[in-house]
Each structure stands twice: as structure tokens, then as C-alpha cells.
Regions:
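Extracellular attachment/recognition segments
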Residues: 2-94, 98-101
Length: 101
């Protein structure tokens, strides 16, 4: 479970975008981990991006991810993020989000 929602507001023209890091964690070599985060308002358009934070390398992709969603209540959504480590070393990650308005 992930409950670490921090955000910054970014304004471009008349559009407001909320950016933040929901959680950080680690994924062991050649394996996958799954996290969830709940109670997101259904009217928000949320985009998820997962980035490796270490180790630093310049060879090939370290991770891939997929996002699934569940309607938690009539007004709230729960997101599931499955993150796969493509490398032979443990990778630390940040799960970042953007709420588009």
C-alpha cells in the first residue's frame, strides 16, 4: 500500500496540473512488485510515470510498469502499479503522478 501523496501545482496558461511523487520503493533484480494507492477522486485524470532512481546506468531500460484501476466507491478510484525490474540488480524507483485538469 502506498500513502505518501505530495504534490506541486504547475500552471501553464489557463491549465493547472498537479505533479507529485506518490511513493518510492525498490524492486529486486529480475522480479516484479505491485503497489496500490487508493481514494483518488474519480473526476481527476491521473497519469502515472515510474522512474528508476538508482543505480545509475547508461545501457538499457531498467524497468517497465503497468497501471490497473478499480472503482473503489461511486466517487473514488484505486490504482494498482506493477513494476518489473528488467535488470540483474535491485532498482529503486519513484512512482510519480500528474493530475491533468
Amino acid at each position: 500500500m502506498a500513502e505518501q501523496r505530495q504534490h506541486n501545482d504547475c500552471v501553464q496558461g489557463d491549465n493547472l496540473m498537479r505533479l507529485g511523487v506518490q511513493f518510492s520503493g525498490s524492486v529486486p533484480a529480475n522480479s516484479s512488485r505491485r503497489w496500490f494507492t487508493h481514494s483518488w477522486p474519480q473526476e481527476w485524470r491521473v497519469v502515472w510515470i515510474v522512474v528508476p532512481t538508482s543505480p545509475v546506468q547508461n545501457q538499457s531500460a531498467q524497468i517497465e510498469w503497468k497501471v490497473q484501476v478499480e472503482r473503489q466507491t461511486s466517487t473514488l478510484l484505486k490504482y494498482y502499479l506493477e513494476i518489473k525490474n528488467l535488470s540483474n540488480r535491485t532498482v529503486t524507483i519513484e512512482a510519480r503522478y500528474a493530475v491533468l485538469d
